[in-house]
Regions:
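Primarily recognizes the serine-hydrolase "nucleophile elbow" in alpha/beta-hydrolase
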Residues: 177-179, 184-232
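C-terminal catalytic histidine-bearing segment of alpha/beta-hydrolase fold enzymes
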Residues: 265-298
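Short beta-strand/loop motif that positions the catalytic acidic residue
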Residues: 232, 237-240, 244
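Short, surface-exposed "cap/lid" segments of acyl-processing enzymes
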Residues: 97-145
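Alpha/beta-hydrolase active-site loop
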Residues: 159-180
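Short alpha-helix in the alpha/beta-hydrolase fold that links the catalytic acid
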Residues: 248-258
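N-terminal cap/lid segment of alpha/beta-hydrolase-fold proteins
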Residues: 57-110
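Conserved alpha/beta-hydrolase
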Residues: 139-161
Length: 298
């Protein structure tokens, strides 16, 4: 049917009031760029499995010493935009049923287009995931990507990495999902925090509310294929340093290969010569979030 100019004008007006594309699960360009020239310009030195596995050129002298004003403590000003902290950041204690959880929230408390939750590792708390200047400014980028695209980012303080910690995050997932009106929730976990991610994969009620997951420098779950998350075929992206002395990259690579061969939606980014903290510094959040929101087959 031929559309008149009036029809097109009406459609354009309707589109202007629709939610962001991330809410409808569209396209790899769902999130608008934020400092991509500084964070996304990474050199792929090896790739296989149709590009699902990529090895990235990582160099400590360039990616830490060349990027930080004070090594590992304060990134150079060009890498951050701190206005988001004053406009949209709030420390709060959420009452979640019979639980209470300390979080830093960036973005709206309700009606968000999507939610990202980051779980820190041992010795961390909500301050780690909301610090603008450490880890090369990568959390500041995550905060801005969420806020600038109508989303909400939560950095909770996880008191333990056992069933109690899993229950706390399950409650946060449920809360975020309800507050947004059923929009996508993405769970991301670093280091020992990955115990929480793997625990959540076994919770069928949480899995119903999740869009996908990212594991940074995490442990491997040999029973992942028995989980509700696996059965739902939700996407998972791994990032790891090749010289991680805490959790061996080879273990996660083995799990990735098993998933990939089963045609499971998965990606793996390996940072050549990278250490345990490298993925928290170097993970390209825009690439990871866009793919989880709309995973492309290999």
């Amino acid at each position: 049917m031929r559309m008149s100019t009036a029809h097109l004008s009406i459609l354009a007006a309707i589109a202007a009031f629709l939610p962001l594309t991330v809410a409808s699960g569209a396209a790899a360009e769902a999130l608008k760029p934020f400092k991509d020239e500084l964070f996304s310009d990474q050199t792929v030195i090896e790739s296989h499995d149709n590009g699902a596995f990529q090895t990235i050129d990582y160099q400590e002298m360039r990616d830490i010493n060349g990027r930080d004003q004070i090594s590992e403590k304060r990134v150079k000003p060009a890498y951050v935009e701190t206005g988001v902290r004053w406009k949209a950041q709030q420390d709060e204690t959420l009452p979640l049923g019979d639980r209470k959880l300390d979080v830093t929230r960036i973005g709206p408390a309700s009606g968000q287009a999507f939610t990202v939750i980051f779980i820190h590792g041992r010795g961390g708390d909500r301050r780690l995931g909301s610090n603008d200047y450490t880890f090369g400014g990568n959390f500041n980028r995550l905060k801005n990507l969420a806020y600038n695209n109508g989303g909400t980012y939560y950095a909770p303080s996880v008191k333990s990495f056992d069933s109690n910690g899993v229950a706390d995050i399950a409650a946060l997932i449920r809360y975020s999902y309800q507050q947004s009106g059923g929009k996508p929730v993405i769970l991301t976990c670093a280091s020992m925090g990955s115990f929480v991610c793997w625990g959540i994969t076994r919770d069928a009620e949480s899995v119903k509310r999740l869009k996908g997951m990212a594991i940074l420098s995490g442990v491997t779950d040999p029973d992942f294929t028995k989980s509700a998350f696996y059965k739902a075929k939700l996407p998972v992206w791994f990032t790891h340093g090749s010289k991680d002395p805490v959790y061996a990259a080879a273990d996660q690579e083995s799990l990735f290969e098993k998933l990939y061969k089963a045609r499971y939606p998965t990606r793996f980014t390996l940072f050549a010569t990278g250490n345990h903290g490298t993925p928290v510094r170097m993970t390209d959040w825009r690439e990871v979030l866009n793919w989880i929101l709309d995973p492309q087959p290999s």
